[in-house]
Amino acid sequence: MVYGLSMNLDSLTQKKRRLDESRPLPPEVLKNLEQWFLIELTYTSNALEGNTLTRLETAVVVEKGLTVGGKSLAEHLEATNHAAALRKVLEIARSPVASLREHILLDLHAMILRGIDDANAGRYRSIPVRISGSRVVLPNPAKVSAWMAEFFRDLLAMAGSHPVEIAAEAHYRLVTIHPFIDGNGRTARLLMNLILLQNGYPPALIRTRDRIPYLKSLEKAQLGGSKEDYLKIISRSVERSFAIYFQALGGEQPNAVASSDLLRIGDLAKKTGETLATLRHWMKQGLLEPADTTEAGYQLFEPEAADRVQRIRELQSDRLTLAEIRQELSSKEI
């Protein structure tokens, strides 16, 4: 397993050494980082799968136990479940890599689907599944158990490789086997981050704006193409988290998204030529989602939201209803 320059391993190793020089991290810094990543990873991982809770709403649900009007019970459970699973990951991360066993993976998956699909939580699938909109053919359910046994044998055999290589490969293989009916992507990202944390690396933070490149890079590799694009995304996600750690050690508040990169709804309207009323209507219909909300209540959008607005208009010109457009734009579980 040699990924070479695609993962920029030397740079990641140097950043790890720099971080090690600051260890043990001051308790208040460590606590702040863990709480920040708890919300950020929960928000981003769920958003990658179509959850419409914003970053601020995710924090309200996870930290305060409150509900958000207009959001489904499943979306609330996805937030609280992922946060609970991530807390479990932080607890397990203190154990050696060799202790990763099947029961840990199944327990994490059970936590992800708790209250959402209890019948399948923590269990391998027994039926065929497909990735919506993808040409990838997933393993026959009768072969899942054998594939997973091989997966864990290979995971142990990778012990001498670079931790970021191991984490990326574990994530890739798990979503490719697709052992569960639902929750494969979230569980794979938890496993990837568990491996990183066990080895002293920060978790990989895959941004919501990287969703399409992330999904396309996985599909490309699964169809027999190069893993280069996928590995670059994972590498940059780890580098991004290193920057957040160093930011916190420098006395700054962790921040994955620079507000200057985001658009207020008025800016988005000007950029796209749409009215505020239209954009707000699309938000209510679940077609358009803010990336964040300021303390003053201003909704902020990723620059890529302009492309989504254009796509909505294109689908409307094809005479699709709003419900059909929402379905077309809906997230594809990986």
Give the role of each language-model region:
Residues M1-D182, R186-P290, T294-Q299, S317, ...:
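FIC/Doc superfamily catalytic core
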Residues P303-L322:
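Terminal helix-turn-helix DNA-binding modules in bacterial transcription factors
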